[in-house]
């Protein structure tokens, strides 16, 4: 029973860690050449391509030169689109970058609570389990809202750019970032389910032990009385 409890709790903690890493990759998308493919959306022409993340942009020119910066005042081949305007108006008003930061922080706190609750002595405290379950479901809802806002807003923006530029600019959705967001939500959901199972099994086990202990206390006086009566007969 103890081994199964440890396996289930460890699985939940690892799921939270994986969700935390996925959120970090999405949040730091387009910060460098390593994370340049984790973009929310990309705009491309025959001359250049821009990948837009939550807090940065990466421009890939025709000669395969990659430049990543928080803002660009202009880009060869994309002169008809103000990239600063894309960042300031679209990202702030539609995607709400603070939501991914909030989800990342809540998921990180949930992971730390999972590590703390896995300790032998501290893990027995029931209120820590309740706090971790609450954090897991809170992380689920925050990531769900973040993913919905990002997916719907980016998809609408991509369609608007494709229809408004008369095929001069090709817009595409950042599939990896969206997949990471939805996968992190699924992992946090799995963590909440495992924590709920642990809490349910633990509470049921405590109730069974309590009833057994109460029955043993009730049976003890009667057994002692019967032993005394048997000795007086002899």
From Swiss-Prot:
Disrupted gene: phenotype observed: Leads to a defect in cell fusion trough defective membrane fusion and organization, as well as cell wall remodeling.
Record InterPro entries: Dni1/Fig1 (IPR033481)
Gene Ontology CC, one term: mating projection tip membrane
Stimuli inducing this protein: Expression is induced during mating.
Record keywords: Cell membrane, Membrane, Signal, Transmembrane, Transmembrane helix
Extracellular side: 33-96, 154-178
The UniProt record lists the keyword Cell membrane: yes
Residue numbers on the Cytoplasmic membrane side: 118-132, 200-234
Signal peptide start-end: 1-32
Localization of this protein: Cell membrane; Cell tip
GO biological process: conjugation with cellular fusion; plasma membrane fusion involved in cytogamy; plasma membrane organization
Pfam families: Fig1 (PF12351)
Transmembrane segments: 97-117, 133-153, 179-199
Keyword Iron-sulfur belongs to the record: no
Protein topology in the membrane: Multi-pass membrane protein
Family as reported in the entry's similarity comment: Belongs to the SUR7 family.
Name of the protein: Cell fusion protein dni1
Organism: Schizosaccharomyces pombe (strain 972 / ATCC 24843) (Fission yeast)
């Amino acid at each position: 029973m103890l081994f199964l409890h440890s396996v289930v709790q460890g699985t939940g903690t690892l799921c939270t860690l994986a969700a935390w890493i996925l959120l970090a990759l999405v949040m730091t998308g387009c910060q460098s050449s390593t994370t340049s493919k984790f973009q929310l959306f990309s705009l491309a022409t025959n001359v250049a391509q821009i990948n837009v993340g939550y807090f940065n942009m990466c421009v890939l020119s025709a000669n395969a030169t990659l430049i990543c910066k928080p803002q660009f005042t202009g880009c060869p081949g994309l002169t008809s689109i103000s990239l600063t305007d894309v960042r300031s108006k679209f990202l702030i008003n539609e995607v709400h970058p603070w939501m991914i930061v909030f989800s990342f922080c809540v998921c990180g706190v949930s992971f730390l609570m999972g590590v703390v609750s896995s300790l032998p002595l501290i893990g027995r405290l029931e209120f820590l389990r309740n706090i971790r379950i609450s954090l897991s479901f809170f992380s689920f809802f925050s990531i769900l809202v973040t993913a919905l806002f990002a997916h719907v807003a980016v998809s609408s923006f991509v369609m608007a750019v494709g229809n408004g530029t008369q095929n001069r600019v090709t817009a595409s959705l950042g599939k990896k970032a969206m997949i990471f967001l939805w996968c992190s939500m699924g992992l946090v959901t799995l963590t909440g389910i495992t924590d709920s199972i642990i809490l349910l099994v633990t509470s049921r086990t405590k109730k069974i032990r309590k009833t057994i202990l109460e029955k043993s206390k009730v049976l003890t006086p009667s057994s002692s009385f019967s032993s005394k009566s048997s000795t007086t007969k002899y």
